[in-house]
Amino acid sequence: DGRVARITSTASDFGKEYDSLADVIAFGVAPALVIYEWGLNAVGRPGWLIAFIFVAAAALRLARFNVQPTRDSRYFQGLPCPMAAAVVAAGIWVADNQAIQGGSAIAVGMVATLMLALAMVSTLPYRSFKDLDVRGRVPFAALLLVVFVFVLISFDPPWVMFFITSAYFLSGPLLWL
């Protein structure tokens, strides 16, 4: 991972590109294949095209991230690929857990996948949380919040993860307003 390479002072240009290739596969190709197999394949070529658009958007997002200088490290420009992949995974998890299927579920999946692709290549601001310092003393309230989130997740993991990932996805347009 790029962050580990920077911490250990082993970063290189090759490593940066290799890391991006791994990210395209993990956060672009894999979720696109998952949502395609989940339901987009039922609509034929449009489903294949939407899955391809998701992969292309992830690749473009990562390429832009590699070449553009950081303006404000507190924000990403566009939805980060791992979060787009997490929204796909959480959405499918909820749909599978609730036995949601059929034409309307596939239509929602198609629209959501396109919206995620657009968010990745957009210039919408998304919090990076890089300004949070967790190396020093962490306030007690922050620890309580972490415990609360884990307890909340334990009640209904699919829905809680879907809510958290969707809230982050929607935060970009809300920060833009």
Give the residues covered by each predicted segment:
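Hydrophobic, membrane-facing alpha-helical anchors
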Residues: 1-6, 53-67, 107-126
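Multi-pass membrane catalytic core of lipid/isoprenoid biosynthesis enzymes
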Residues: 3, 7-65
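C-terminal membrane-associated helical module and adjoining short loops/tails
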Residues: 73-177
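Hydrophobic, well-structured mid-protein blocks that either form specific transmembrane helices
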Residues: 47-91
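Generic preference for well-ordered secondary structure
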Residues: 2-5, 9, 46, 60, ...
